[in-house]
């Protein structure tokens, strides 16, 4: 206090975040999954959005754990999503980075479904209640399920097997402005044109 006199001291902290429950065969530092997962968890720091979501859904104090139990959430779907999020992709500077990370902090109380939807949209997935559990469907590359062609399509009376319609060109977006918290700029909000 003698160094600063009567000046107001400003403090900044660089926090890693919470210790979460992650799969027992997962190494968060290397982002590697070894062997077959037995469905058990271990505590570790992770910024993988799938395990941040698991924490939010099952934690009884600040999450939805008082309403949802671990058996009510499809951990196997989150495991596959977590692996996809951890895949290395080019970072644009000659290196690689994980495909999707989560460095969020929640500061206001909101409806649970809104927070759940926001978490899911960050990793390109949707929450789905299948009648027994809360599961997740992610938009990611996968094998084709069915090929449609003239031999397996019912023809209408006019003989045209397919009718195509598209949105107007003026209604299609080809760029979007994204706001994000930039750790390289003092954690200030930055806008990026993508």
Located regions from the model:
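Polar, S/T/G-rich
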Residues: 1-123, 130, 181, 186-188
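Surface-exposed, non-catalytic interaction/assembly patches
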Residues: 3-6, 103, 137-194
